[in-house]
């Protein structure tokens, strides 16, 4: 099974001005595509060559895991954002955030603090844990909640420097502030609904 680069669901300039076309082009067509090419090379003629991307993430380690997880994480990141998104949450995710964090503003502040305070490269996640409670998680490098079995991902934000250095240089806080204008609450609602049914 050849791992392919998932198609973006919006144009490269669709997230501008919050994330520029230049950033999205490099991030998607260079970084994300690079992980795909590298993984296919690594799994050739191995048992992983017949497995799905998600199974590779769950079962692998080392370089194979790093590249597989980065493919999965990036796809989830693209879907966590969208044009004409952002603003206040709605539907089930709004109610669940209020239930587990007290208010959207509390959640937004806590999540932003995690994203800005994370040392080095990684990811910030909103996930549903085994107690059906929304939690904020942070993972280093290619880590994700699926591999760590710490929760079912609902949303993610990429805090590797390549996600923001073209647009914001070393100012991660400004990138995080801009990211809130792109959050795809419809995607979050879909993920929450599926997660609550498991």
From Swiss-Prot:
Homodimer. Fe cation binds at residues 27, 74, 158, 162. Keywords: Cytoplasm, Iron, Metal-binding, Oxidoreductase. Pfam families: Sod_Fe_C, Sod_Fe_N. Gene3D superfamilies: Fe,Mn superoxide dismutase (SOD) domain, Iron/manganese superoxide dismutase, C-terminal domain. Its EC number is 1.15.1.1. It comes from Plasmodium malariae. It comes from the Eukaryota. Destroys superoxide anion radicals which are normally produced within the cells and which are toxic to biological systems. It catalyses: 2 superoxide + 2 H(+) = H2O2 + O2. This is Superoxide dismutase [Fe]. Belongs to the iron/manganese superoxide dismutase family. It is found in: Cytoplasm.
